[in-house]
Regions:
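Auxiliary Fe-S-binding modules of radical SAM enzymes
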Residues: 1-23, 229-305
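N-terminal pre-triad scaffold of radical SAM enzymes
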Residues: 12-65, 82-91
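Short loop/turn motifs at secondary-structure junctions
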Residues: 37, 71, 95, 100, ...
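Iron-sulfur cluster-binding cysteine motifs and their immediate structural context
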Residues: 39-46, 65-84, 94-110
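Extended, non-globular alpha-helical segments
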Residues: 55-61, 108-123
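Anion (oxyanion) recognition and catalysis
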Residues: 91, 155, 215, 295-296
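Conserved AdoMet/S-adenosylmethionine-binding subsite of the radical SAM
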Residues: 114-269
């Protein structure tokens, strides 16, 4: 298979030994950049493709070393408070290298497919019985050429592949990627299109069209459904999830994902606010009834992850 491993993309990181991003033990590549702006996003640093400055104030010990190495006046200390002037930041990263408590970070780095494959192949021993590579985000379709090249490189080595996608992208990109993807972890967030736009920034028509496309191509799909209190936890949405599973034989499983508030702290570290600011975790046990409700209506496995 022809493949260009010199293609580069923008990622957040590569995580190893992941167990919730597809079957088996997986190496998950988190790309940067997403066309959606989900109000509850737990990885807000993945929304913009640009490199971004993150300051975790709760970790800062006020040592002041960052201010001494920064030549742009980003850091200042007054009355025991560490102030960060993001407008002055040039993203040089010097301060992050001096911070020994991980309070400072530049989110985003450029990397080639070849460099990622070096990490993937180092993990290959764990893929012998199950597992593989998952491309997540952000949104893999947002960097479609890079995603295609990485999938091609994995298939050249016989490695199982998944992508986690919101489904918002060009049909031609999805068709190419589907030929190389063993499993789509396809997000289904909201049934009502107007509410979908309110909470994610886009309507859901294109997403549903692309779900239909990959299902008619015979792709293997796991429908992943974030459960967000006061947003989509209602019988209308549960019934729609079941209807999709019954409509498309390509949908092999349904995964319910309980809300967690980790994204709130990340948004603060980026200098933003979070539109959905529920601070309590949704416990897995709180979804037992939802899981049973949907399972009674479908023939595929439904589980909370």
């Amino acid at each position: 298979m022809e493949n260009n491993t010199s293609i580069s993309g923008t990622i957040i990181n590569v995580q190893h030994f992941c167990v919730d991003d597809g079957p088996g033990i997986r190496t998950t590549v988190f790309l940067k950049g997403c066309p959606l702006r989900c109000a509850w996003c737990h990885n807000p640093e993945s929304q913009s493709k640009a490199h971004e400055y993150m300051f975790r104030q709760y970790k800062c010990t006020d040592c002041g070393i960052c201010a001494s190495v920064c030549k742009n006046g980003v850091h200042s200390f007054e009355n025991g408070i560490h102030n960060v002037n993001r407008e002055h930041c040039k993203l040089c990263g010097k301060c992050t290298l001096t911070c020994c408590v991980d309070a400072l970070e530049i989110s985003g780095k450029e990397i080639t497919v070849c460099e990622i494959m070096d990490e993937v192949l180092a993990d290959r021993v764990f893929y012998k019985r199950s597992g593989g590579v998952t491309i997540s985000g952000g949104e893999p379709l947002f960097q479609s050429e890079f995603t295609f090249a990485l999938l091609s490189a994995c298939k050249d080595k016989g490695i199982h592949t998944c992508i986690e996608t919101c489904g918002y992208g060009k049909a031609e990109d999805i068709k190419r990627i589907a030929e190389l993807c063993d499993i789509f972890l396809f997000d289904y967030k909201l049934t009502d299109s107007a509410l979908h736009k309110k909470y994610t920034g886009v309507n859901n028509e294109l997403i549903l069209e692309n779900l239909k496309l990959i299902c008619t191509m015979g792709a293997n799909v796991i429908l992943r459904c974030p459960m967000i209190p006061d947003v989509n936890m209602n019988e209308n949405h549960y019934n729609a999830i079941a209807e999709l599973a019954n409509k498309y034989q390509s949908i092999r499983e349904i995964h319910l994902e309980p809300y967690h508030p980790i994204g709130i702290g990340k948004a603060v570290s980026l200098g933003r606010t979070c539109d959905y600011d529920r601070s309590e975790f949704l416990e897995r046990s709180e979804l037992d009834d939802v899981c049973s409700y949907i399972a009674d209506k479908v023939s595929v496995e439904v589980k909370v992850i």
